[in-house]
A protein has these predicted regions:
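Solvent-exposed, acidic/flexible segments
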Residues: 17-20, 24, 177-181, 208-212, ...
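...with weaker cross-activation on analogous glycine-rich loops/strands in unrelated enzymes
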Residues: 208-269
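Surface-exposed patches in mature extracellular/periplasmic domains of secreted proteins
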Residues: 38-46, 195-207, 226-236, 242
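Active-site or metal-binding loop neighborhoods of secreted/extracellular toxin and effector enzymes
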Residues: 103-144, 260-313
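Substrate-binding/catalytic groove segments of enzymes
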Residues: 37-38, 63, 195-198, 249-264, ...
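Function-determining sites in protein domains
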Residues: 1-148
Length: 313
């Protein structure tokens, strides 16, 4: 069998389905005849928006097609970009035939025509942005040496304090399992749960929609408070985080670090401190959060504090 994952979202789980042996085998044969359309699954584009389609063999039988057990298409690295993108569209065009498959992830990300439309639109935007994406792939994470953790006075809120910590992307990026199973909400709260944490899951109700009010309510039920609602010293360490929304589609979180910048972790990809243009993030309200009409994190929902009593799962 062949597992298909569209690498797309930052907060909610990515669209995923499983092809049976016949369909999966036919697809692999097609790919094997044109291997210049594939790339390694961990080296391509990893910003906000469409990041390619991951294909993963679920059995240990040696592949007669001599393909790796896990690889990607349409992630910015394939030698034949056009053919790689065309195949991505072809796979997504057929995804709704799997919408009745029983997978736990479908509760948060159904494989339906609405998600299909978002993916196809995001692929179109990806193709338009391909030159920018290929430049982005070459960017190296950079960070200054700074104190491990400091308490700062919030410049926007008299009498409020919070903690900033040193940017430490290797904590999230060095282990492939950790990187794949923790998302932007984990990064914002600074808690590695390995559950791809969702706002409200621990407190009993995830967001009813991908909107500022719904995701905000779910996160506050986990214990976050709005900025300027000062947290006491007993909540140390208190993080300053920011929430943005791709309306109706997805959410994303940022966390303030020492050094005057913000870090984030788009979905199962690497933690970093730069935006979709490769620019160091000094303000999540104005940084590049995507483009196009299908998956663009246009709505800024506000700043929040996350104290030590915030529990996520």
């Amino acid at each position: 069998m062949l597992k298909i994952t569209v690498d797309l979202f930052s907060g909610r789980p990515n669209p995923t389905w499983i092809m049976d042996d016949k369909r999966g085998g036919d697809l692999l044969k097609k790919i094997s005849r044109k291997k210049q359309i594939i790339s390694r699954s961990d080296k391509g584009y990893n910003g906000l928006g469409f990041r390619g389609i991951k294909l993963e063999l679920l059995g240990d039988e040696p592949s007669s097609n001599k393909l790796p057990s896990t690889f990607k298409i349409a992630d910015g690295l394939a030698k034949d970009q056009k053919a790689s993108i065309d195949l991505a569209r072809e796979i997504v065009d057929q995804m709704t035939r799997y919408e009745r498959t029983n997978m736990d992830v479908f509760r948060l990300t159904p494989i339906d025509r609405r998600i299909q439309k978002v993916i196809l639109g995001s692929i179109e935007q990806y193709q338009r942005d391909l030159k920018r994406i290929q430049k982005y792939i070459r960017i190296k994470i950079r960070w200054p040496i700074s104190p491990i953790r400091v308490t700062v006075n919030d410049s926007e809120c008299p009498n409020c304090q919070y903690e900033e910590s040193r940017f430490n992307p290797d904590f999230w990026n060095a282990d492939p399992y950790v990187m794949a199973n923790n998302n932007c909400y984990n990064y914002g709260r600074n808690w590695k749960t390995n559950t791809f944490a969702q706002p409200g899951r621990h407190s009993g109700a995830t967001a009813s929609s991908m909107s500022c009010p719904a995701v905000k309510t779910a996160a506050m039920n986990d214990g976050l408070v709005e900025r300027c609602d000062c947290l006491p010293q007993s909540e140390y360490p208190r993080r300053l985080v920011a929430l943005v929304i791709a309306p109706g589609i997805d959410y994303h979180w940022y966390r303030k670090q020492t050094g005057g910048f913000w870090g984030h972790k788009p979905g199962p990809t690497a933690a970093r401190n730069y935006d979709n243009s490769g620019v160091l993030i000094t303000d999540p309200q104005t940084c590049d959060r995507g483009a196009g009409t299908y998956l663009n994190y246009t709505d800024f929902c506000g700043f929040f504090y996350a104290g030590k009593s915030v529990i996520i799962s």
